[in-house]
Amino acid sequence: FGNVLGSSGSVIPLFQQQISFGGPITITHPEATRYFMTISEASQLVIQAGSIGNTCNVYVLNMGNPVSILALAKQMIYLSGHILKTSESNGDDSGIEIQYTGLQQGEKIHEELFIGDNITSTEHPMILEATESFCEWSMVEEILDQLKSQHNLSAEKLRQLLLQFAVDSTHKEN
């Protein structure tokens, strides 16, 4: 779905708050990029996608190129009337520092809107359809039954069982 500008989970209000407190601005990684859309675009995506297809389709707004989070942070610092505090600031406390916190578990440096290359256009010029493969519910029930029947599974046995399920579901699709 992308990052919705101005929403409660958006990085923009967080950066604004961090700047208003004098910094630092926290960023996970210097090369991190994300896609953004406005609240209006997100609302329109939901409405338009609902009118285009059926319930099994996955739709994504064409949001253009990803945005560098570091560049966004720097721009917000400058637009707020501050300067960027760097290691060359020599003790000058007048700038806003950027600190890198590291990626959280499961977080990626570059956001992906699609998995794979199965992307097609729709009747709406800004909405794309992703043809994603997913397994049948019967396969999910099968693995759940296997998991329920196995008491006190070791982490390794659980990993092997889930890996086998992933391999089996891939072969059944092809």
Could you tell me what each predicted segment is?
Residues 1-174:
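Strand-loop microenvironment adjacent to phosphate/nucleotide-handling motifs in alpha/beta enzyme folds
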